[in-house]
């Protein structure tokens, strides 16, 4: 048994608080257990140089952690003058996940900036960031549509992420920091609400794993992502086949 009597195949308690930031076009606070991330989406009426004149938008992400989001204080990367490799990896993952579920040709020549700021870290910060980023992004795009700046909400599906690992020879879902630190194998799965995979990162930490173990981790993660998609869907009325997404008045959802 794990902390708080959590089962091996059980997600941590998840909570999403929408409109957490009063300024951003879309925002939320997402919590996975003790991990807390503020996600915002901001709209810029411009695109990167490689997209100018192509009548296509872009979505990109930045990720950071507050100095005391962890057990000991870390220097801000802005102070060190260098963005770390882990930060680059995570923010690119967030951006790819968002772009996977939207038709960028239908949002005009504008950029949606996703900012994910970890205020407390206890494992799974990248997965929580992706789950929250989707809510922030979708709300921002719905706002564009409501303002008649675009004529549809071209989002195909929800997208979420979860971690799975092998800890002390046991398969575990949604690892906290202690579990992740002791994992022999660690996997991060990014997938849409209908189970189509966007990205899988799987690696052995000074260990190897079998194809059977890989498939077991993948199955466990994909099954849990159905629950996460259901949580995200609480916030919307949607018919993706006709590019229709509307906000419900829901401000908070829990799992």
UniProtKB/Swiss-Prot annotation:
The protein's role, per its UniProt record: Phosphorolytic 3'-5' exoribonuclease that plays an important role in tRNA 3'-end maturation. Removes nucleotide residues following the 3'-CCA terminus of tRNAs; can also add nucleotides to the ends of RNA molecules by using nucleoside diphosphates as substrates, but this may not be physiologically important. Probably plays a role in initiation of 16S rRNA degradation (leading to ribosome degradation) during starvation.
Gene it is expressed from: rph
How it assembles, according to the record, is: Homohexameric ring arranged as a trimer of dimers.
Domain of life of the organism in this record?
A: Bacteria
Q: Which keywords label this protein?
A: Nucleotidyltransferase, RNA-binding, rRNA processing, Transferase, tRNA processing, tRNA-binding
Q: Name one GO biological process term.
A: tRNA processing
- EC number, UniProt record: 2.7.7.56
Q: What family is it from?
A: Belongs to the RNase PH family.
Q: Transferase as a keyword?
A: yes
**Reactions this protein catalyses:** tRNA(n+1) + phosphate = tRNA(n) + a ribonucleoside 5'-diphosphate
Name of this chain's protein: Ribonuclease PH
